[in-house]
Amino acid sequence: MKTEQTPWWKKAVVYQIYPKSFNDTTGNGVGDLNGIIEKLDYLKTLQVDVLWLTPIYDSPQHDNGYDIRDYYSIYPEYGTMEDFERLVSEAHKRDLKVVMDLVVNHTSTEHKWFREAISSIDSPYRDFYIWKKPQENGSVPTNWESKFGGSAWELDEASGQYYLHLFDVTQADLNWENEEVRKHVYDMMHFWFEKGIDGFRLDVINLISKDQRFPNAEEGDGRSFYTDGPRVHEFLHEMNEKVFSHYDSMTVGEMSSTTVDHCIRYTNPDNKELDMTFSFHHLKVDYPNGEKWALAPFDFLKLKEILSDWQTGMHAGGGWNALFWCNHDQPRVVSRYGDDGAYRVKSAKMLATAIHMMQGTPYIYQGEELGMTNPKFTDISSYRDVESLNMYHAFKEKGMADQDITAILQAKSRDNSRTPVQWDATENGGFTTGTPWIPVAGNYREINAEAALRDQNSVFYHYQKLIQIRKMYDIVTEGTYEIIAKDDPNIFAYLRHGSNEKLLVINNFYGTEAAFTLPDSLAPDEWKAEVLLTNDEAREGLQNMTLRPYESIVYRLTKPC
């Protein structure tokens, strides 16, 4: 049971590992569990606290492991259950916790439950999934769309019924209305906790409760009928009661298209649901008119507004944010909101500071601490991601020019973050002695962990310092948030307020100089200013600054005694 006043995960920093692309010890081109064990000391040097592993369960890998075939076994290319147990043990020896990624909105259609369900309309497993008859005119049951394109319904010709798949056709949605499904899920969670894990990251968990009327969407893709659905809070409270309450664990829910109000309900400890949530609104400010697969500069003022609304809203409601720029589904942030050319190192540090000095639990995605960039693939044969390949074919059918398709995929593909971690300057960045499952980014000779560890001014050591500041100053965890100069077109500045101190965080998001003046009322002259961290040369005074391109500074302001 959680008894301590400040739960451990509020001061923790999480490192996300995408095992397939992390470190390969067998030479088969695919990362593995032993590869993670081999790099635990590197992660300890970074000073992170928690490792989150994206799915390592047995899977046909149509969606890189988010299509689970067997919840109780390890995907053979990653290793064995013994390897996993050794990973947990070796991590714990280094005071590193291990969080598993769990997908319970859907399973692979190769899962034994689905194979049983589709075998007969009378199967006891039929009701583990969501089946509907066609409409009277013979069309699909509803006009809901899959998030990977096309209808969310797939016909089972043998029975004449359709099953629901909000994602790929090989990912059938589970029926959470069925108590047996929920019991099986909770039993499986206990199995992994008994293996010694420290928590779960729950994939698209706010989609598990569907509106049982299954109405047609008047506009859009139908998401309003299953996002933050009618019974989702009931189900998560039950999950907490049956499972999480028995362990000193950390739980984080991935929330698709959610709201601040729902995330307060998910994470306020009084509700006993989850510990924290991921939301993605700040990663849609470069979607023109909400369209992911179109190119546009990011809307900086909108970015500041969204991050600030989540900071103030979640704090006021007693919720807790997961803080992040990157994951396995997003492009590399230095290519997206920074400058991956001349200002790569400086903008990567600035972006790190901007997110890490907020309230919440920060997440670092593998390679982010090195300032890894989008790979800028020029050939469709380099891509592996099902969503990207679907979009490529859709664009080709529309007659879009190849160079335009290339530009969109280079900016938007999920494969941007899935290229192998660049460990050193040897072939394939030291990731594998074989042929990597996806090409390594071409800049691995310049951008790699070995070079970063040798250079005290590297992005790596900037992340390390941010982690140290979080551990040293409670204000980072507990202070309130106030945005400054919210309409400034270049600078993202905010204050964190404590009882006798403040943190002033100033970030220039662009490659040009920008003037900044701190209002006197926010930091009176008699307050003492100390620079905790900068990505540039130190400067004197707080007034009338001209920030250099991508400059970032953290001041600690203290009241005189």
Swiss-Prot record:
User: Record's SUPFAM superfamilies?
Assistant: (Trans)glycosidases, Glycosyl hydrolase domain
Q: How is activity regulated here?
A: Activity is stimulated by high salt concentrations with different efficiencies depending on the kind of salt. In vitro, inhibited by glucose.
Asked whether the UniProt record includes Cytoplasm among its keywords, one would answer yes
In terms of pH, the activity is described as:
Optimum pH is 4.5.
Give the induction text: Induced by trehalose and repressed by glucose, fructose or mannitol.
GO BP terms, alphabetized: oligosaccharide catabolic process; trehalose catabolic process
Cite the record's statement on how activity depends on temperature. Optimum temperature is 37 degrees Celsius.
Which UniProt keywords are present, listed alphabetically? Answer: Cytoplasm, Glycosidase, Hydrolase
**Reaction(s) catalyzed by this protein?**
alpha,alpha-trehalose 6-phosphate + H2O = D-glucose 6-phosphate + D-glucose
The record's GO molecular-function terms, alphabetically, read:
alpha,alpha-phosphotrehalase activity; alpha-amylase activity
> Record's NCBIfam families?
PRK10933.1 (NF008183), trehalose_treC (TIGR02403)
What does the record give as the function of this protein? Hydrolyzes trehalose-6-phosphate to glucose and glucose 6-phosphate. Can also very effectively hydrolyze p-nitrophenyl-alpha-D-glucopyranoside, but not lactose, maltose, sucrose or sucrose-6-phosphate. Trehalose is also hydrolyzed, but to a much smaller extent than trehalose-6-phosphate.
Identify this protein by name: Trehalose-6-phosphate hydrolase
Upper taxonomic lineage: Bacteria, Bacillati, Bacillota, Bacilli, Bacillales
